[in-house]
Design a protein with these regions (language model features):
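Surface-exposed, charge/polar-rich loops and edge strands
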Residues: 1-225, 249-285
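Intrinsic disorder/low-complexity segments
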Residues: 222-251
Length: 285
């Protein structure tokens, strides 16, 4: 069975969402991120790629990078740009890219099920990248990017989602890259119970993207639950803050967005070579 839980998200103020929301941290270089966030102090890149606020050439894994991310994250909260919901809930998130549309469920997934293989993996992780995400989670006491999961579509869930997204969205904007983002929340007891029960019947979930994020979350969970506390889990600082970002404490959940397989679209992931090393294109082939 797949265990998904509602959570009290820390979300962008609706009218600021377009200025806050950004692409994932790992699809751009530091220089590209600096250009994208230039002149926009609300850009979430100040949190997800905080080296952009430090001198060029700063070691990406230096302690001051994570400290700057924490500082910027707390600033967005203090300014009211990010606000936490008062009650746990599920969230529905739609992306429209050209003619393609997909609607996923944003929820707290189980670190235990990740470790036991209920959440299926398909790739190995790089130690340096995994460690980077561990340190980012520990510094912020939050996860700032969801793990992208999928499951075999269930008709009852499809019908439930289709009904719910006819209501007025809470966030609705088109990003600079042309992708249209829309979000709704499911906070009523009946809706929450239905979603949890339907997923409890699903035998497994699959990671589509986010192996480093999920592995890092599981490591933080194991560390905290076994008593090897990070500096941020001192007495009085144990509140989990699953955000549009999300925190992992000893409760053992990680932020995920889960799409049915029927709406998934496989996109090319082409590599670009900067230097052929004196080889001709024919020789390279």
């Amino acid at each position: 069975m797949a265990t998904l839980k509602p959570f009290a998200a820390l979300r962008p103020k609706p009218e600021l969402a377009e200025r806050i929301c950004e692409l994932p941290y790992d699809v751009m270089s530091s220089d590209e991120a600096r250009q994208m966030a230039a002149g926009n102090p609300l850009s979430f890149l100040h949190v997800s790629k905080p080296e952009i606020d430090l001198p060029s050439g700063t070691d990406l894994y230096a302690p001051e990078v994570y400290a700057k991310g924490k500082e910027n994250f707390n600033r967005l909260i203090a300014e009211g740009a990010l606000r936490q919901d008062t009650q746990p809930r599920f969230y529905l998130y739609r992306q429209i890219m050209g003619r393609h549309s997909q609607v996923g469920l944003v929820a707290a997934a189980s670190c235990e099920e990740h470790l036991r293989g209920v959440i299926k993996k398909h790739e190995l992780t790089r130690p340096d990248k995994e460690e980077d995400r561990v340190r980012h989670i520990e510094a912020l006491n939050s996860q700032t990017g969801p793990v992208f999961l999928t499951y075999r579509a269930v008709a009852a869930l499809d019908e439930f989602v289709a009904r719910r997204i006819t209501g007025k969205p809470e966030v609705d904007f088109t990003a600079k890259d042309g992708v249209h983002h829309t979000a709704w929340s499911v906070g009523d007891a009946e809706g929450i119970k239905f979603i949890a029960a339907e997923f409890a019947r699903i035998p497994c979930l699959y990671i589509a993207d986010g192996h480093h994020r999920s592995a890092a979350a599981a490591r933080v969970y194991l560390s905290r639950s076994s008593g090897r506390q990070s500096a941020l889990t001192s007495p009085g600082n144990d509140q989990s803050r699953l955000t549009s970002a999300a925190t992992v404490g000893s409760s053992g959940e990680f932020l995920a967005v889960i799409f049915p397989h029927s709406q998934m679209q496989i996109l090319p992931y082409n590599r670009v070579l900067k230097d052929l090393k004196n080889l001709s294109p024919d020789q390279l082939q």
